[in-house]
């Protein structure tokens, strides 16, 4: 079904499940492992003897060679991307004061890997690799127990995951946020998930850092007459695979492309939107206003338009399919949705690093010192002024 009018807001209905999720969080906080075992039996239909996966080596040894080779190759690609984004130590000096920033990794990180019809090893790679490259010392992973297979185990072993927990849903987020007898309390939780996972991340965010609250998948395709309509259609279908609430928009200057897309996609069950524009500059204005998760620049000379993009989670240039970013290009597939790309980007090493600033007053300018004292006194902080003055008078 096609729609020409873009909705002003995107679907985000996790508020409906907040009361239930809050009950789950409270159960885990109050009763720890016992609550987790009961909740796993209730929601994941898993009667567990242990919340910790103890068969990682055994399972990892059973990975088929073709998947092992694929994981190894993708691992190298993702590591290379994230290594190129590591910050340099920043330092300088002015008015007799040395100053700078030290980058330090978060100590303990929890990763949620969702379950569904299949396991999602790509999400484990996308979340754990930037954490390891950033220098995180302890990484703990939670995923539904029926989704721990040889591929997940192989990645966990390769990335030296400290523990793999057999827990799904809101109860997994609660366990990572507050800790239990078996589950380590972490400093930050990252990873995608369903409406219950997102609601739980929202609720625990007052107690533990999170990467963000993510909604359904989003794709904006900007295309001109040079775009291969078959590839455009495939990209739109690919993102629609994430579910019926996927938010998919074609913004184009081409009537031919509109006709071809409609001819194919009007048969589909998912909803999509088309915006006809007069120029690619106008299309970019539309995309910047939407601030999508994925943005595809399917135009002639796409790099020449990059400087005009202000809001997007990840950008696919030319023939590059967004699906390649989802798996192996290098950038992360854990991306902001629901217009959050206005203020933040996809998962990077910076999500696992914190800047610590320092100053060393070697021979500070006397006038600067006196001005600091003056402002301290103006604000009513007399001992701030005295503390400064005692050093330099």
Swiss-Prot record:
Taxonomically, which superkingdom?
Archaea
Keywords assigned: Amino-acid biosynthesis, Histidine biosynthesis, Metal-binding, NAD, Oxidoreductase, Zinc
Please give the Pfam families that the UniProt record associates with this protein. Histidinol_dh
Tell me if Glycoprotein is a UniProt keyword of this record. no
State where NAD(+) binds: 112, 171, 194
Which residues are noted in the entry as Zn(2+)-binding? 239, 242, 326, 384
Molecular function terms from GO:
histidinol dehydrogenase activity; NAD binding; zinc ion binding
**Cofactors that this protein relies on:** Zn(2+)
The entry's substrate-binding residues are 217, 239, 242, 294, 326, 379, 384
Q: Which InterPro entries match?
A: Ald_DH/histidinol_DH, Histidinol_DH_CS, Histidinol_DH_monofunct, Hstdl_DH
What EC number(s) does its UniProt record assign? 1.1.1.23
Task: Briefly state the protein's biological role.
Answer: Catalyzes the sequential NAD-dependent oxidations of L-histidinol to L-histidinaldehyde and then to L-histidine.
Q: What is this protein called?
A: Histidinol dehydrogenase
Q: What is the source species?
A: Sulfolobus acidocaldarius (strain ATCC 33909 / DSM 639 / JCM 8929 / NBRC 15157 / NCIMB 11770)
Gene, per the UniProt record:
hisD
